[in-house]
A protein has these predicted regions:
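Buried hydrophobic packing segments
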Residues: 20, 24, 91-92, 195-198, ...
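Glycine-rich phosphate/pyrophosphate-binding loop regions near the starts of catalytic domains
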Residues: 26-185
């Protein structure tokens, strides 16, 4: 992926981040030999959304993520109850891309100074959203680390399970398959450094209190802080309605699932197209939310760059066999997830967004 100039100006070095991820992956790979021919042997995946361990008849799926600098917005507003949705979404929606049902999560909160009221709000929210997804909080860690961090850092690990014969790797995707887009009304937990930089540059240090220009953004009387804190949609349970929880029957022929996080659609959809001759034509994605259009305008961000930073209203893409399109949309609607046909898989070898 090319370097995104605006993101670099916001203090995010994409090139260094990619290089660091590559180094981390390299050393993680050196540990795989330790489980060779043993229970829990890792399955090597290229570009997957989570790790896979072989447990005989099923795979254990693991993944880690966090809420990133969305926490800073919560700290500005003094509102922490909805961040649990973001934490659950980041890890469970990665795992379900492989067809896995997440059964448990652990979380780690590092804080300059612990505050029992804030911890209570965070964990009460996390418990609420986990219970809705039928996920157990199996453990966690709270650490007061002084000036090692500025504010708080909240991350989680998810553990999921999927039958071997039911794992979704994207290798069965073919031209003519339909791409369904699931709507997202916020930024999820990605691209906040850029959004915050744009708003600070335009409105100063108290940007989160700004209201006047928001009539154009279609968000009523909300402040920019409230808008950015919009909780993520959690797709996990709805997607399980398509692929089935562990031991349940699969309702439709799902061939690939893409969680649209950092990198946007251009950076994430290719991860599930194992046949590099395949591409996609997306001519009916969900429209860009009005507030994101306003961010793009305020920051003078190129649309191409915006696509690689934010989800632009499309939080997940699901590739299904054409014959199962209508049934898929019906199941997603039943699970209260807004979904639409966004396009189709092609033989073009490229992602075309119209």
């Amino acid at each position: 992926m090319k370097k995104i100039k605006k993101y670099a100006l916001a203090g995010v070095n994409i090139e260094e981040g990619d290089a660091s991820s590559s180094i981390a992956g390299k050393f993680a790979g050196t540990t795989f030999a330790g489980r060779k021919n043993k229970i829990g042997e890792p399955v090597k995946l290229l570009g997957g959304f989570a790790g896979i361990l072989d447990f005989g008849k099923y795979y254990l799926v693991t993944g880690d993520d966090g809420v990133g600098t969305k926490m800073e917005v919560a700290e500005r507003l003094g509102k922490f109850d909805s961040l649990g949705a973001d934490l659950v979404a980041m890890v469970s929606d990665d795992a379900v891309c492989l067809g896995a049902e997440v059964v448990s999560m652990t979380n780690t909160l590092d804080a300059a100074k612990l505050d029992r009221k804030i911890v209570g709000e965070l964990l009460k929210g996390l418990a609420h959203f986990c219970l809705k997804q039928k996920i157990v909080i199996a453990g966690g860690e709270l650490a007061e680390v002084g000036d090692a961090v500025n504010g708080m850092v909240w991350n989680a690990t998810a553990i999921g399970i999927v039958a071997k014969k039911r794992v979704i790797l994207g290798d069965k995707i073919k031209a003519g398959d339909i791409v369904i887009a699931l709507r997202e009304n916020g930024l999820r937990s990605n691209g906040f450094s850029l959004a915050r930089k744009i708003l600070k540059d335009n409105f100063g240090k108290d940007w989160h209190k700004e209201k006047p220009a928001l009539a154009k953004a279609g968000v009523g009387n909300k402040t920019w802080g409230e808008i950015l804190l919009t909780p993520s949609e959690i797709y996990h349970a709805a997607v399980l309605g398509l692929v089935g929880r562990f031991g349940e029957k699969r309702s439709v022929d799902v061939r690939g699932i893409c969680h649209v996080t950092g990198g946007g659609i251009p950076g994430n959809l290719p991860r599930i197209l194992k046949n590099k001759k395949l591409g996609a034509k997306l001519d009916n994605l969900w429209p860009i939310p009005k507030f994101v259009e306003e961010l793009i305008r305020l920051g003078k961000v190129d649309l191409e760059d915006a696509r690689e930073v934010w989800n632009l209203g499309n939080g997940m893409l699901i590739v299904v066999a054409a014959k199962d399109t209508a049934r898929s949309l019906k199941i997603l609607a039943k699970n209260k997830i807004a979904a639409r046909i966004a396009g189709a898989i092609t033989n073009s070898g490229k992602i075309e967004i119209v």
